[in-house]
UniProtKB/Swiss-Prot annotation:
HTH tetR-type domain segment(s): 20-80
Annotated source species: Aromatoleum sp. (strain CIB) (Azoarcus sp. (strain CIB))
Highest taxon above the source species: Bacteria
Protein name from the UniProt record: HTH-type transcriptional regulator HbdR
Gene3D superfamilies: Homeodomain-like, Tetracycline Repressor, domain 2
Pfam families: TetR_C_24, TetR_N
Activity regulation, short description: Activity is regulated by the effector molecules 3-hydroxybenzoyl-CoA and benzoyl-CoA, which bind to HbdR, alleviating its repression on the three target promoters and inducing the expression of the hbd genes.
Amino acid sequence: MDMSSAESVKSVVTDPKLVEERRHQIISAATKLFSEQGYYTTTILQIAREAKVSTGLIYQYFGDKDDILFLTLKNVLDTYEQEIPRQIEGLTHPVERLCHAVWAYCAVVDAQRDATVLAYRSTKSLRADRRVLIKDGETRTNRMIEKSIRACTAGGFMRPVNEYLLCYQIVNFAHAWALKHWAFVDRFSLAEYVEEGLLLLVEPFLTAKGKTAMAKVPRSAEALVREPT
């Protein structure tokens, strides 16, 4: 995701590999603390202690706490933008592509549950120009889902539907795995949750030939979700 250079986070350290490693370490600690005690009450000192680094080291990689929150949220969106296209690469059938896209979205949310919850709670805490960038990033991700839905309707595999609204129903469903994880975790595995979601949010809108196509889509998580390369 190319978020305007004017909004990039400056680092004193110039080694890209070291910057990536240290920022990952610091962001992981910050995500935990922001989720547990809130963005405003968390201090740089607390983040440093959680990450087992000095406050001085943090300031070599981030200018301030807003930088840390921004990169935390940006990382989630980057992962969506990387994983969804990767999961549907090489797939030609619209129904199969849509199912894989939903799976990919939910799998990323599952892997980054704390950060997903944090995005809902704390995007408003970013300065205004960065809030716009985060919203733009989410919109780009959502368009990938919407495009998959549109391909299904255009191909006659799904009846005419408000593609924009259905897209957001799917997005909200994926996010709910993190936001309401406490309510779902004792009832469903991730695989069961996504399977039920496909039955609720995709299958009812399919035409006869769309249902035939969906019946051929693998149901297991192992078959649907491709391991990172």
